[in-house]
Each structure stands twice: as C-alpha cells, then as structure tokens.
Amino acid sequence: MKKILVFISAILLFAACGKSNPDVNVEGSWHLTEISSLKGDVVDVWISFTGNECSIWQKGSAEDRYSKFNGQFSVNGDKISGKYADGSSWGDTYKAEKSGDGKTLTLTAGSGEVSTYTKAEVPTTVTSNTYSTKADGTSAGRWL
C-alpha cells in the first residue's frame, strides 16, 4: 500500500511539472501609452495582431504621417516574437503580460525596456495617414 501511494504521488508530481504556461492572447489592436526608455521623445505606435499576422503603424514627433510595417508573429507561453514582411526579425523577443481585465498589454524586451499598450481600435486618422507599406530591409526605425 505504501508503494502504491509513493507511486501515485510520483505520477502526480511529474504531471504537475509537465504543465506549461498557456499562450498570452494578444489578439486585437493596441495603442502605445508608455515606454520606459523614452523621456521627452514623442512617438505614436499602434499594433494590430490578427491570427498570426500583425501590422504596426508608427510616427515620430518630427513626422507628419505614419509608417506601416506588416509581418507575422508567434506567441509561445508568455513570449512573443515576429518577422516583418521582408523576412527580417523583430529586434527582440518580448515577454507579454496582459492585465486581468484584458485592456492593457505590457511587452518587456530582453534589455528590460518596458512598453505598455492599451486595447483600442486603430483609428482611420492613422490608417488613412500612412506612407506606403514598408516591406524592404532598408527602412530605418522599426518599432519592434
């Protein structure tokens, strides 16, 4: 009987160790509201995740229109990574955390830089004020 209890305990222990974290659901559109590394610089960023595809609209303080970058992304547990349409990888793999109410997404880069996004639909004032989609490797200043 004692051996059976030890055996059952061992099975339960191994089963508990085998559980993995579920993927963070980043589906939807997000607006950058805060970034730890930007002090005084103004940047406006919108990100939309749909299926495994993403679109990123970004505009710096000196720009009058948004640049748009398309690509694909994947989520593995709490890690998110991606590639742009030209095949180049994002600058980092990010740790993704969503608030309990699902309205805030926090991405933490390997460098420790933290970006906070609020769930919001990308407005037409952004999508209609966009330079042609950036798809080549010569575009500078990609957000992710």
Residues of each region from the PLM?
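Structural motif
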Residues: 35-39
